[in-house]
Design a protein with these regions (language model features):
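Nudix hydrolase/Nudix homology domain
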Residues: 71, 78, 95-135
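Short, well-ordered beta-strand micro-motif
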Residues: 5, 81-83, 103-105
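Active-site-adjacent beta-strand/loop module that shapes the phosphate/pyrophosphate-binding cleft
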Residues: 69-88
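Recognition helices and adjacent regulatory flanks at domain boundaries
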Residues: 11, 18-20, 47-51, 55, ...
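A short coil-to-beta-strand element that immediately follows conserved catalytic motifs
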Residues: 56-63
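Conserved Nudix-box catalytic region and its N-terminal flanking loop in Nudix hydrolases
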Residues: 1-47, 93-95
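Structural motif
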Residues: 12, 24, 74-79, 99
Length: 135
């Protein structure tokens, strides 16, 4: 799951973290996998949002399900939008995770994409779908 969390004051909740595959620190939306076969995408999104960022939302909606990279695997990404996200103060990272929380005003999103500050494909897809949904 990948979560587009938007706060009441119209900031998007991002995480900044090192990604070994590209050897860079990237600005991306929070996300993660399913804990069990019984967990659905909205439950996984709620759990991952709070674990990675300490934010919670009671207003979640599925935006789309996309193939991650159909050339090499069968992974899918469930894009979830979480409106009215609020900090709960309870971040629960895995022992190997180092995550910085970054709030970006919605009005700055396009500029950050155009300038290459946001360059992860799933994050960009969720942003475009979510911002279209909001307009």
């Amino acid at each position: 799951v990948l979560i587009l969390a938007i706060t009441c004051d119209r900031n998007v909740v991002f995480v900044r973290q090192y990604r070994h595959g590209v050897g860079e620190i990237l600005l991306e939306l929070p996300g993660g996998g399913f804990n069990s076969m019984e967990e659905d995408s909205l439950q996984a999104a709620a759990r991952e949002l709070e674990e990675e960022t300490g934010y919670v939302s009671d207003h979640m909606v599925s935006l789309a399900t996309l193939y991650d990279n159909p050339v090499k695997d069968t992974n899918t990404i469930h894009l979830i939008m979480a409106e009215q996200a609020q900090p709960s103060g309870i971040q629960n990272l895995d022992i190997t995770e180092e995550v910085e929380i970054v709030l970006v005003p919605i009005d700055e999103i396009m500029r950050k994409i155009e300038q290459g500050e946001i360059c992860v494909s799933g994050t960009i897809a969720a942003l475009f779908l979510g911002l279209k949904f909001l307009s």
